A protein has these predicted regions:
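N-terminal Sec-pathway targeting helices
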Residues: 1-27
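Membrane-interface motif at the C-terminal end of an N-terminal transmembrane signal
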Residues: 24-41
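Substrate-binding cleft of extracellular glycoside hydrolase catalytic domains
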Residues: 38-54, 71-157, 161-163
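Functionally critical loop-and-helix segments that line ligand-binding/catalytic clefts
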Residues: 40-53, 58, 185-186, 190-246
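Structural preference for beta-strand elements that scaffold enzyme active sites
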Residues: 43-45, 66-67, 96-98, 126-130, ...
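Membrane-interface segments at or immediately adjacent to transmembrane helices
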Residues: 60-66, 74
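Flexible, glycine-rich phosphate/dinucleotide-binding loops
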Residues: 77, 106, 177, 199, ...
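Catalytic domains of cell-wall/extracellular-matrix polysaccharide-remodeling enzymes
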Residues: 128-204
Length: 246
């Protein structure tokens, strides 16, 4: 016991100094983070589908969220059952709102774009349409030929641009990007899914415009079977965001 008392006394000052340094570092980090985010004015957004259930968009908009992408369609015969209510309600808030569709490799590019156009209104102030390009199912092991997919994408891009007056964005992951988009369609902005790094990098002449950095965020304001929500960040500050999507 006496030895313990002696050890505590001998080490008391260094321990207290260490604790003090730790506290200072914690406070410094908190202040740095606040300063960094306040000055960078980062622009955060969510993307949702029917899996999030009924969404209170006012509540979503009050949690530091600036934009939202809503699932609209898949292929040529599927519309997300909550798209219309989500679109209408989200546009009543101060959020910038856009829609996306999931690509079906078994159907034509032009037909899929037309089906999206049929279901997504052309309204001023909306974000550009998004083409969600991901390998799925059996295509994960046996990807479609690059020529086929590039022809499909070309049809989609041209059809959407003609209707909405702006180049669509392509959402994708690294696997699909490297398969079809690296060194191709360099005029098209990329929305990259990367939940494992702190600085996504794209090869082949592209810069990302949006980065999906988390698929497991929990926010207030929705009640669906999916408790998590996807989080995204714009590649720039609020000034750049407003300039790009005025």
């Amino acid at each position: 016991m006496e030895r313990l008392k002696t050890w505590v006394w001998d080490h008391k000052v260094p321990v207290l100094i260490g604790i003090g340094i730790l506290i200072v570092l914690i406070i410094a980090f908190a202040l740095w983070r606040t300063f960094y985010y306040d000055n960078k004015k980062i622009v955060l957004g969510v993307d949702v589908s029917a899996y999030q259930g009924e969404i209170d968009w006012e509540v979503i908009s009050e949690q530091g969220i600036s934009f939202a992408y809503i699932k609209a369609t898949e292929g040529t015969d599927f519309i997300d059952k909550r798209f219309n209510e989500n679109w209408t309600a989200a546009r009543k808030t101060n959020l910038k709102v856009g829609a996306y569709f999931f690509v079906n490799f078994n159907e034509g590019g032009k037909d899929q774009a037309k089906y999206f156009i049929k279901n997504v209104p052309k309204e001023s102030g909306s974000l550009p349409p998004v083409i969600d390009l991901e390998l799925y199912g059996d295509y994960l092991d046996n990807p479609p030929q690059k020529e086929k997919v590039n022809t499909m994408l070309k049809e989609m891009i041209e059809t959407l641009k003609e209707e909405y007056g702006e180049i669509p964005i392509i959402y994708t992951n690294y696997n699909t990007y490297n398969q079809y988009l690296s060194n191709a369609f360099t005029e098209v902005p990329i929305w990259i899914c990367d939940i494992s790094s702190s600085n996504p990098e794209l090869s082949g002449g592209h810069q990302w415009v949006f980065w999906q950095y988390s698929q497991r965020q929990i926010l207030q304001g929705y009640d669906g079977e999916e408790r998590f929500i996807d989080m995204n960040v714009f590649n720039g500050d609020t000034k750049a965001f407003k300039a790009m999507f005025n």
